[in-house]
Amino acid sequence: MPGRLPPRLTCAFVALLVAPSSHSQSKAVVNEPSAFPSPETLFYSAEWRLIFAGDARLSLEPRKRSDKTEWESKLEVESGGLVSKLYKIDDKYHMAMEDQFCTTATNLDAMEGKRHHEVKVTYDYSRRKASYEEHDLVKNISKTAETEIPGCVTDILGALYKLRTLRLEPGQSAQIPVSDGKKSVSARVEAQEREQIKTKVGTFNTVRYEAFVFNGVLFARKAQLQMWLSDDARSLPVQIRARMSFPVGSITFTLDKVEHP
């Protein structure tokens, strides 16, 4: 359905959806800080209305293609606790990107409540087109769409990786071309304030960002998307929060663990 973001991806970067300074976290956070981009696996816990809502796992790996490096990212989101009893979610999102984090393909396999659907988007830069295919695996219904794209564009998760390379200072902003296969926009991202965020793995100095992709920009839903990135060379997405209107409210993903292969 146009303008509708899958519930879990709304929050992770889905919601998710991350910029730099020095860090004062404990040594338990990461043994050897690695500048971004580098291979990584990030683990998050989700909170909804002050209760545990589930877990997310986000990985990034390089893939050598002839003389250039491409990237592959996987996001897995699973509801937990009371939330899982109310509305079970098991989403798997896979994304391929070129060297500069230009998205080439995405695949979403989403099981949400009684729904089960698959969404594939292909970004064809030779044609400057993105093609969208959605299949409802329960009702056996399919939808397709196509939109024009620029020479380099990201999906909503790829925009997070692109943002991590920009190293914006508070008060600065950037425009990131984003497409979900049905619509293409130039999304504004603002670096707003430096803040300290406490997590299970330590305390991070971060920069808080806001990404303007809701309220009819890319997605019709009324919402606010904020991200806190570590203020260092890693630019880790320490926290991601989606604030939505009643009855959903706010969902927050907080970093629990970092692994570097």
Which residues fall in each region the model found?
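Bacterial N-terminal signal peptides that target proteins for export
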Residues: 1-11
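Hydrophobic, well-structured mid-protein blocks that either form specific transmembrane helices
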Residues: 119-161
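Acidic, serine/threonine-rich low-complexity disordered tracts
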Residues: 25-125, 165-261
